Amino acid sequence: MKPIAVITGASSGIGAATARLLAEHGFHVVAVARREDRLNQLSAEDENIETLTIDVTSDTDVQKLAAHLQGKPVEILVCNAGGAFDFDTVITSDPEVWMKTYDVNVVGSVRCIKALTPLMTKHGKGHLVIITSTAGQVAYENGGSYVAAKHGEVALARTLRLELSGLPIRVTEIAPGMVKTDEFALTRFSGDSERAAKIYAGVEKPLTDSDVAEAIRWSVMLPEHFNIDSMTIRPVAQAAQHKVHRITQQ
């Protein structure tokens, strides 16, 4: 049986691109997300992509995923489910949004890692890939809930690497900078397409979801003794979180 790669948040964007790429490179992909219609479209593309409708904020759903994978060669878990849900200052923000952001990004990853790491240990090898963000390396205005959550995921990856020392399980954190996907900015701005478009305005070549998928593929296909602790990837136009070269229209 082919080695299994489980990818969360796989109905669109980075998750869907990663599912396609790993399926092309010899993995049996179990793609999980909440939106069944999107998952059905994904599984129709490749017989090596299996899908399950799973909400990572649900203990019951994640246990269902673990039960489905019992006795199977689970080697890769890509914790990609996440998102930003506001662009408010700390003072004007809604604490419920902070709770949601932390649950989806951090606790959702914890649930999946707790459920699937024992399967990797039993199989004899595994690789946990946590998709964070450059927002986990710095702070910026109006991004408190997301910045806090991504810092939490960075801490999660570093802690896991220490706690799993001695086991044949790799832990990699991949921190993308500016990635232009169909949904991230739209979700952050509650569907306001004009505000979302301004994020990428004038940036000649932001990263794409396929670029991040390639970084994930590269890291998981390295020799098994080789661990990438963390990887930061940005478009050339983004020198730092706050420094983005934009081409202005004349």
Predicted regions: what they are:
Residues S11-S12:
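Conserved glycine-rich cofactor-binding loop
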Residues H25-N40:
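Conserved glycine-rich Rossmann-like NAD(P)H-binding loop of the short-chain dehydrogenase/reductase
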Residues I113, A149:
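Active-site helix of classical SDR
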Residues S133:
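Residue(s) in the substrate-gating loop at a strand-loop-helix junction
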